[in-house]
Amino acid sequence: MIGRLHGKIIEKQPPEMVIDVQGVGYEVLLPMTSFYSLPQIGEEATIFTHLVVREDAHLLFGFAQKQDRTLFRELIKTNGVGPKLALAILSAMSVSQFANAVEHEELAKLTKIPGIGRKTAERLLVELKGKFKGVAQSDFFEEHSVETIVATHSHDPADEARDALVALGYKLADAEKMIKKVNKAGATSEQLIREALKASL
């Protein structure tokens, strides 16, 4: 199991990055909440990882904080929630936001995330409720400030942001509408993704 990587970021294409660790480039999928805190291409970063082994692929998921990875692992234990859906959940809301949604049984908030229907949302509430007691006092859910968002090398931030939303499970037409609503001159793809996800909840 690969639990942690430290190296130089050589590619960033939301929601994927490539990190060079002593000459080996690891492709890593990250939730957008972690992607926002990545430093610039060429700089060093440390990410916590979870390896998913399938018949057709080995997928490496990365997280800026340990508590993000812990929630990811709890999510994929839930019946009907695979790694890609867990990634979409963590892209749409922070760990503490998700914990609050579960503890307060905010079904509507959960069903706004692509791939989560009413049944899956109800299952999440049943299986995870009670696991987040005292989240405000817990270091596990401590909010961490994120570094300033930096531009990825892209020709069109709006197209890149749209593609990232599609990769997270949104339909192309919905992704285009979401980006169109928040698009503004000078915005980076990461800023557009963040604003689009925030507006969708």
Curated annotation (Swiss-Prot):
Region (Domain II): 65-143
GO cellular component: cytoplasm; Holliday junction helicase complex; Holliday junction resolvase complex
Record InterPro entries: DNA_helicase_Holl-junc_RuvA_I (IPR013849), Hlx-hairpin-Hlx_DNA-bd_motif (IPR003583), NA-bd_OB-fold (IPR012340), RuvA (IPR000085), RuvA_2-like (IPR010994), RuvA_C (IPR011114), RuvA_C_sf (IPR036267)
Keyword Secreted: no
Disulphide bonds in the chain: none
Localization terms from the record: Cytoplasm
Pfam family, one: RuvA_C
First-listed, main subcellular location of the protein, grouped into a coarse class: cytoplasm
One of the GO BP terms on file: DNA repair
Record-linked Gene3D superfamilies: 5' to 3' exonuclease, C-terminal subdomain (1.10.150.20), DNA helicase RuvA subunit, C-terminal domain (1.10.8.10), Nucleic acid-binding proteins (2.40.50.140)
Domains: entry comment: Has three domains with a flexible linker between the domains II and III and assumes an 'L' shape. Domain III is highly mobile and contacts RuvB.
Function: The RuvA-RuvB-RuvC complex processes Holliday junction (HJ) DNA during genetic recombination and DNA repair, while the RuvA-RuvB complex plays an important role in the rescue of blocked DNA replication forks via replication fork reversal (RFR). RuvA specifically binds to HJ cruciform DNA, conferring on it an open structure. The RuvB hexamer acts as an ATP-dependent pump, pulling dsDNA into and through the RuvAB complex. HJ branch migration allows RuvC to scan DNA until it finds its consensus sequence, where it cleaves and resolves the cruciform DNA.
NCBIfam families: ruvA (TIGR00084)
Entry protein name: Holliday junction branch migration complex subunit RuvA
Originating organism: Actinobacillus pleuropneumoniae serotype 7 (strain AP76)
Classification lineage: Bacteria, Pseudomonadati, Pseudomonadota, Gammaproteobacteria, Pasteurellales
Gene: ruvA
